C-alpha cells in the first residue's frame, strides 16, 4: 500500500524510470544481429551449465526463448541430456502454471506468441523446482530485474521458495540499478556472456 503524497510521487518516478529502461533495452536488444545473439548465448550457456547450483538440481524451470532473447534451446537440450527434469511455464489468467517437458515434446504458441507446453503435459508444483532460469530485459547486481511488464515472474518467484533463481541476460542488459517497486522480487544469480553475479541485496 502506498502512503502519502511524497511516497506516491517516488513510486511514480520509479515506475516511469522502469518503463523507460524497459523500452530502451528492448530497442537495443531488438537491434542485435542474430549472429551476435547466437555467439553471446553460447557464452551464457557455457557459464550457466557450469554453475554448481544447476549441477546439483534435478528439477529445473527454464523458458522458451523468442526473438532476440538469450537462446535457451541449447541449455534445455543439455539439461535433458544430463537427466534433469525440465519444466516450462504456461500463461494462465492469474499467472504461470508449470509443466514438465520431455525431449521431443511439441510446444504450442501461447500468450504473446511465446512457445509453451500443452495444457495436458504433467503439471509441476513450484515447490518441486530446485533451480529456475528467468528472462529479463534488464537486471542489476542485486538481482532486481525488469521483465515485460506483465508481473508474471514477480508472482512466481516468491513461490519458488526452495529454488535458486537465475536471470539470463546479455551483458549490456546489466544496469547499475533497477528502480524496484514494492512487489518486485529479486533473483539469486545473474549470468551474462561476460560474468556470473551472485546477487547481494
What are these regions (language model features)?
Residues 2-128:
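N-terminal active-site beta-alpha-beta segment that forms phosphate/nucleotide-binding
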Residues 2-11, 96-201:
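Conserved phosphate- and dinucleotide-binding cores of soluble alpha/beta proteins
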Amino acid at each position: 500500500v502506498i502512503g502519502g503524497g511524497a511516497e506516491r510521487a517516488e513510486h511514480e518516478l520509479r515506475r516511469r524510470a522502469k518503463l523507460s529502461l524497459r523500452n530502451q533495452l528492448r530497442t537495443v536488444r531488438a537491434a542485435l544481429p542474430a549472429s551476435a545473439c547466437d555467439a553471446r548465448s553460447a557464452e551464457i550457456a557455457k557459464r550457466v551449465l557450469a554453475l554448481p547450483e544447476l549441477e546439483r538440481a534435478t528439477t529445473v524451470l527454464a523458458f522458451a526463448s523468442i526473438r532476440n532473447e538469450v537462446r535457451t534451446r541449447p541449455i534445455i537440450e543439455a539439461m535433458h541430456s544430463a537427466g534433469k527434469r525440465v519444466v516450462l511455464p504456461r500463461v494462465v489468467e492469474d499467472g504461470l502454471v508449470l509443466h514438465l517437458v520431455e525431449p521431443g515434446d511439441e510446444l504450442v504458441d501461447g500468450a504473446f506468441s511465446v512457445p509453451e507446453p500443452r495444457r495436458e503435459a504433467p503439471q509441476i508444483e513450484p515447490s518441486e523446482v530446485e533451480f529456475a532460469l528467468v528472462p529479463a530485459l534488464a537486471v542489476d547486481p542485486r538481482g532486481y530485474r525488469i521483465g515485460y511488464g506483465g508481473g508474471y515472474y514477480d508472482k512466481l518467484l516468491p513461490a519458488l521458495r526452495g529454488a535458486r533463481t537465475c536471470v539470463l541476460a546479455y551483458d549490456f542488459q546489466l544496469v547499475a540499478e533497477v528502480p524496484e517497486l514494492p512487489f518486485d522480487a529479486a533473483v539469486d544469480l545473474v549470468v551474462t556472456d561476460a560474468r556470473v553475479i551472485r546477487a547481494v541485496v
